């Protein structure tokens, strides 16, 4: 790691601190990332070498400028919730720039350059550490094309996700009764996309979802369509039970070819309720 500090010194000043002007810092280096972000069987992660460079200018002012670059070409990364997987063979360089302002909102812009991903967004941090994400665009030109907005404050996260395509094929209901530690107290998500990819590489349309998560408690309401056919899915999970409800006039359009529903249902319609006991993990299906 290389760090350079530069400043100007006013000669013959009686106040040494006040005599120091135009304080700037420049740093360049690399670090080995090896982060696993959850205890899911298929966890989110980032692995590999990240090259970085950044500069911080006007350190003594009320408007500190920061800009830099993160080169993630030599990393692998995975976000399970939207099945976004970056391979080491893919280029991803992120530029960031912005200003720290004393007693005011600080705004930073993040964008990809010379990359296999299109990423562009704005992050704002208030003087009370309230974080806002504004129109954060993510497009990997394959299975993810989304715009994310939201905020995080006092361990409450709100996210609004819209776009042309979201991939939910790696989202699976895990059955376990392990105790977990939660950083967030409440998570609120609203999702609206033109298309969605379900498990089995099934692509359907008009996906909508509302998700409320309060630590171990979860509430999900979602829907999708394929031509004139409809699917509704809901889930209510608390400390005692985990209830899943699936309703469709033709479920075969929403599941993969290997799914049991394609073999077991005579008329393809379904209205299924599963209630699982979270203590013994036994389920009743009706």
Description of each model-found segment:
Residues 1-115, 120-286:
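Membrane-proximal interfacial segments on either side of biological membranes
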């Amino acid at each position: 790691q290389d760090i350079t500090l530069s400043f100007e010194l006013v000669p013959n000043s009686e106040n040494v601190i006040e005599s120091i002007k135009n304080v700037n810092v420049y740093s360049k280096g690399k670090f080995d990332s090896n982060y696993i972000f959850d205890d899911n069987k298929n966890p989110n992660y980032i692995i590999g070498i990240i090259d970085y460079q950044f500069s911080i200018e006007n350190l003594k002012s009320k408007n500190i400028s920061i800009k830099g670059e993160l080169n993630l070409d030599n990393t692998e990364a995975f976000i399970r919730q939207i099945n976004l997987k970056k391979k080491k063979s893919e280029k991803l360089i992120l530029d960031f720039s912005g200003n720290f302002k004393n007693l005011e909102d600080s705004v930073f812009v993040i964008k990809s350059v010379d990359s296999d991903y299109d990423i562009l967004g704005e992050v704002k941090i208030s003087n009370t550490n309230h974080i806002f994400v504004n129109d954060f665009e993510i497009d990997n030109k394959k299975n993810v094309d989304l715009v994310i907005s939201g905020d995080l404050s006092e361990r409450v996260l709100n996210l609004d996700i819209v776009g042309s395509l979201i991939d939910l094929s790696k989202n699976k209901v895990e059955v376990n009764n392990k105790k977990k530690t939660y950083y967030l107290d409440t998570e609120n998500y609203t999702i609206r996309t033109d298309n969605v990819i379900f498990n089995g590489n099934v692509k359907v349309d008009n996906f909508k979802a509302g998700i409320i998560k309060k630590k171990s408690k979860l509430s999900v309401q979602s829907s999708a369509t394929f031509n004139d056919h409809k699917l509704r899915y809901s889930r209510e999970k608390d400390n005692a039970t985990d209830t899943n409800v699936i309703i469709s006039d033709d479920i075969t359009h929403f599941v993969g070819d290997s799914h049991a529903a394609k073999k077991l249902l005579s008329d393809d319609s379904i209205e299924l309720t599963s209630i699982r006991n979270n203590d013994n993990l036994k389920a009743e299906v009706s």
